[in-house]
Amino acid sequence: MGIKNLNSVTASLRGTVLLDKSMLWKGKPEKSLVSYKISRGGRNSRGVITVRHRGRGHKRLYRVVDFKRNKVGVSATVERLEYDPNRTAFIALLSYDDGEKSYIIAPNGLKKGDVVISGDGADILPGNCLLLKSIPVGTFVHNVELRPGNGGVIARSAGTYAQLMSKDGMYVLLRLSSGEIRKVLSDCRATIGIVSNLDNQNVKLGKAGRSRWLGIRPTVRGVAMNPIDHPHGGGEGKTSGGRNPVTPWGVPTKGKKTRKRNKSSNKYIKRVSDKG
């Protein structure tokens, strides 16, 4: 997959960069693997905004993705690669030898007709799923479990990965794409390869409407608000806020660490993320 630059026939198209989806499935998703998803627009059950800048967006069907990969020893053939509106990565439709079908996160390089399998004896090829203790040091993996059998939670978005750095008894050391180095139980499963759609970071939507299709509402600057709405609000004429940048709740917003110091999982993190 790649990106496509559009002809600059308008001012907004001049900077627009979109994904080239010509190699993806153009039909409907597998009917047995979809469910309805209701957009809450960032509201909770009482109608109160709990997440700002969220809107309705385009209607979507949720694709049920298999993050556990617990069909051990059963080979599956990749029927097709599909676009998933609910995530940045592409997904692959698998057809198992016993007739069952499922969606998985598509790793980079996976293509129609490839055969994948889950199990300790599997080859180190993109799409195969193994226990971390069975994967060679230096291998790039994704969809990594934190608790055995609970399904992958690490490295699932487009272009992300975790590299197996070393093995130490019950644990292995993983370096995430953020730079964080973390201990994970060696009995957890992971899938070989880097997540597909590496060019997602280069996309430029080009117009406000595409953001609205994705369910993203406008972000208003604090200095444009009233004093009751934001610490930067108010003032006569155009003002700069008069203080160091903060969130609407007064928390410094330029690099302040927000992770709790006494979090129980701190003992598993050997090096914090380069991105803070």
Swiss-Prot record:
One matching Pfam family: Ribosomal_L2_C
Entry's Gene Ontology molecular function annotations: rRNA binding; structural constituent of ribosome; transferase activity
Chain positions covered by the region annotation Disordered: 224-276
UniProt feature, compositional bias: Basic residues: 254-270
Listed InterPro entries: NA-bd_OB-fold, Rib_uL2_dom2, Ribosomal_uL2, Ribosomal_uL2_bac/org-type, Ribosomal_uL2_C, Ribosomal_uL2_CS, Ribosomal_uL2_dom3, Ribosomal_uL2_RNA-bd_dom
GO cellular component, one term: large ribosomal subunit
GO terms (BP aspect): cytoplasmic translation
Keyword line: Ribonucleoprotein, Ribosomal protein, RNA-binding, rRNA-binding
Gene3D superfamilies xref list: 2.30.30.30, Nucleic acid-binding proteins (2.40.50.140), Ribosomal protein L2, domain 3 (4.10.950.10)
PROSITE patterns assigned: RIBOSOMAL_L2
Assembly behavior: Part of the 50S ribosomal subunit. Forms a bridge to the 30S subunit in the 70S ribosome.
Family classification: Belongs to the universal ribosomal protein uL2 family.
Function of the molecule: One of the primary rRNA binding proteins. Required for association of the 30S and 50S subunits to form the 70S ribosome, for tRNA binding and peptide bond formation. It has been suggested to have peptidyltransferase activity; this is somewhat controversial. Makes several contacts with the 16S rRNA in the 70S ribosome.
Protein's UniProt name: Large ribosomal subunit protein uL2
